[in-house]
């Protein structure tokens, strides 16, 4: 059974779906399944030239926007690369980016297409100051959801809250399947350790949407209250200089370590005590599940998929976004009470192990894929056609 996992970012990109898919591929490795990964190399720019036409809206209405123009050129480039590189048939294509799914439907019109929408690109741009709320760019990006609904055989997303977000932009929201990302519990796992001073950590791209400015302000309050801690910020991005300057201004720079980009955060994560990320928006928040599998106590904001992962006071703590006082109060609780911190981490690990392990997600995906693959339409795998009837 030939499956194509179609990504936008290369698989080596850290975080979210890009870090999940290579491990997903390992779990599908058998005589029954053959999975290929595909993405657009960063070097491919301005190669595609053909027109772009959508069925449910006219993108040219928004064509004066440079951001929209960039999206359309990316579509052209991805289509050009797909037509150049993909020659064999597939039994099913699973796309993980809106533009990718639309390209795959155009290039492979008769192949079943499953589309997962992992995040709201329009709100990321709004929160990061790239576009205005209510802008033509936001309207263009939200129009893509109905186009995806029209072109996909199954539309999926990663949290119930994000499905609710999609309601105004699609015709049949009740048909959207919710399946969280899965995480390799052999890669993200606890390591016994003892820290004399509580170790806080965040892992994210350094952009305004992640709320790290609020975290630094909360840490300044903790310091004023006399609490010792070390804050580890793993990641890089356009806000790094501003965040380092803010840390100096608040007097917490000496208590904060900016690591920059790291390819394998799981090598650091198990040795810390508390994971905190005060995001202003998250469709799911994959890094919370990863931290939970490493037995860290979770502190997050009551937004999007974070509040589906964390039950406040049970397996973590939730605070409102943009509230450094309540964030400091929550951190104070887990810093002051190691037993409470341990209990939150334990229940968080149990939930992540049960609901977000990659084994669970693989089983759900296999059931979903098989719905679209009648036996008489399965393309034989090389050298194993006679073994197709085997059950894993």
What are these regions (language model features)?
Residues 135-155:
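Membrane-proximal helix-turn-helix segments that form the acceptor-binding/catalytic region
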Residues 297-300, 310:
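Short hydrophobic beta-strand element within catalytic cores of glycosyltransferases
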Residues 6-14, 20-72:
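N-terminal strand-loop element at the rim of the active site
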Residues 312-313, 317-324, 333-338:
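Conserved acidic donor-binding segment of nucleotide-sugar-dependent glycosyltransferases
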Residues 261, 280:
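Aromatic "clamp/platform" in nucleotide-sugar-dependent glycosyltransferases that forms part
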Residues 161, 182:
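Carbohydrate-associated surface elements
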Residues 244-260:
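Nucleotide-activated donor-binding/catalytic signature segment of Leloir-type glycosyltransferases, i.e.
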Residues 95-100, 117-118:
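Short His-centered aromatic/hydrophobic patch
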């Amino acid at each position: 059974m030939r499956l194509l996992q179609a990504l936008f970012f290369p698989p080596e990109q850290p975080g979210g779906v890009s870090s999940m898919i290579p491990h997903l591929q390992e779990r599908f490795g058998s005589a029954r399944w053959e999975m290929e990964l595909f993405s657009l190399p960063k070097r491919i720019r301005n190669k595609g030239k053909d027109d772009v036409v959508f069925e449910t809206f006219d993108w040219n209405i928004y064509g004066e926007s440079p951001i929209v123009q960039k999206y359309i050129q990316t579509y052209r480039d991805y289509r050009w690369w797909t037509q150049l590189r993909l020659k064999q048939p597939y039994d099913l294509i699973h796309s993980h980016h809106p533009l990718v799914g639309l390209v795959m439907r155009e290039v492979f019109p008769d192949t079943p297409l499953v589309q997962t929408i992992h995040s709201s690109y329009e709100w990321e741009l709004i929160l990061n100051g790239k576009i205005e709320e209510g802008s033509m760019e936001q309207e263009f990006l939200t129009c893509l959801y109905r186009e995806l609904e029209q072109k996909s055989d199954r539309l999926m997303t990663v949290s119930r809250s994000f499905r609710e977000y999609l309601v105004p932009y699609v015709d049949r929201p009740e048909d959207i399947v919710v399946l969280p990302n899965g995480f390799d519990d052999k890669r993200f796992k606890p390591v016994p350790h003892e820290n004399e001073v509580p170790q806080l950590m965040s892992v994210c791209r350094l952009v305004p949407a992640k709320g790290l400015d609020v975290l630094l302000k909360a840490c300044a309050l903790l310091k004023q209250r006399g609490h010792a801690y070390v804050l580890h910020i793993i990641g890089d991005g356009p806000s790094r200089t501003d965040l380092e300057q803010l840390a100096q201004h608040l007097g917490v720079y000496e208590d904060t370590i900016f690591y920059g980009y790291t390819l394998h955060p799981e090598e650091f994560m198990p040795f810390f005590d508390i994971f905190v990320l005060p995001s202003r928006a998250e469709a799911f928040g994959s890094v919370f599940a990863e931290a939970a599998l490493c037995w860290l106590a979770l502190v997050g904001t009551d937004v999007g998929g974070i509040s589906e992962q964390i039950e406040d006071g049970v397996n973590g703590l939730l605070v409102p976004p943009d509230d450094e006082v309540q964030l400091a109060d929550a951190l104070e609780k887990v810093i002051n009470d190691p037993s409470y911190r341990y209990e939150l981490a334990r229940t968080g690990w149990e939930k992540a192990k049960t609901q977000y392990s990659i084994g669970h997600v693989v089983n759900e995906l296999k059931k979903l894929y098989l719905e679209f693959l009648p036996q008489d339409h399965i393309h034989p795998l090389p050298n194993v056609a006679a073994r197709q009837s085997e059950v894993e």
